Amino acid sequence: MVAVDYFTKWAEADALANIRDVDIKKFVWRNIVTRFGVAKSLVSNIGLQFDSNTFQKFCFDLGIKNKYSTPVYLQSNGQAEATNKAIVNGLRKRLEGTKGMWAEELPNVLWAYWTTPRRSMGETPFSLTYGGEVVIPTEVSLCSERVSRFVL
């Protein structure tokens, strides 16, 4: 499951064993609402899990408008398609033919996605989401100026 914020290009993704309405509801609650607040709208494919009474009520109760992309024209949800492609390509590069480990590599691929500037904006999704650049592990080990200013 992948969710993308259209403005910041921030992506949340999780390896779900099932994609039932209750699983999607749990994903939206854990990965979006509790971290970033209630979304104004949600654009999804017209899968049954997004169109179920359970998920519709969940969205209605939170004031989220549930919208659908056109099933025959996937480009109508182009941001999600581009993000899916970036995540799949990142997983392919990290796994190099090894199958079955993609769920363990997903957080690493997301980290790379969040901290890489997007061409369309010239900024990272991380900086647009949190208002500053991420401190990367190399900065800590080399004690960069940004890190040394905050050493207690």
Labelled PLM ranges:
Residues 1-152:
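Integrase module of LTR retroelements
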